[in-house]
């Protein structure tokens, strides 16, 4: 169950980062304060909840194991950047993502 909490904390953290990115997109396009405040508010809510979940994880998992698992954030953000904003990702970047996933699998299998 704690591993699901860790994954959910990671996803919420990423959602917060994506909301921040979306706020900057609105700022560049039409400078509507209402939209910027909405996206930044969502970012704060996601990041705040992620922090609470992260504290629960740290109560149950050694920090030396838990913290590297947050590398999942790089994977989620890369996938979202490609899907949502059609950002280009180089082969080198994808190789890095593969190494991150491999590292997470190795660390996760030792627990």
Swiss-Prot record:
Any one Gene Ontology cellular component term annotated for this protein: plasma membrane
Annotated membrane topology: Multi-pass membrane protein
Pathway: Bacterial outer membrane biogenesis; lipopolysaccharide biosynthesis
Membrane-spanning segments: 36-56, 61-81, 88-108
Keyword annotations of the record: Cell inner membrane, Cell membrane, Lipid A biosynthesis, Lipid biosynthesis, Lipid metabolism, Lipopolysaccharide biosynthesis, Membrane, Transmembrane, Transmembrane helix, Transport
Primary location: membrane
Claim: Cytoplasm is one of the keywords in the record: no
Role according to the record: Translocates 4-amino-4-deoxy-L-arabinose-phosphoundecaprenol (alpha-L-Ara4N-phosphoundecaprenol) from the cytoplasmic to the periplasmic side of the inner membrane.
NCBIfam families found in the cross-reference section: PRK15051.1 (NF011625)
Identification of the protein by name: Probable 4-amino-4-deoxy-L-arabinose-phosphoundecaprenol flippase subunit ArnE
Organism for this UniProt entry: Escherichia coli O45:K1 (strain S88 / ExPEC)
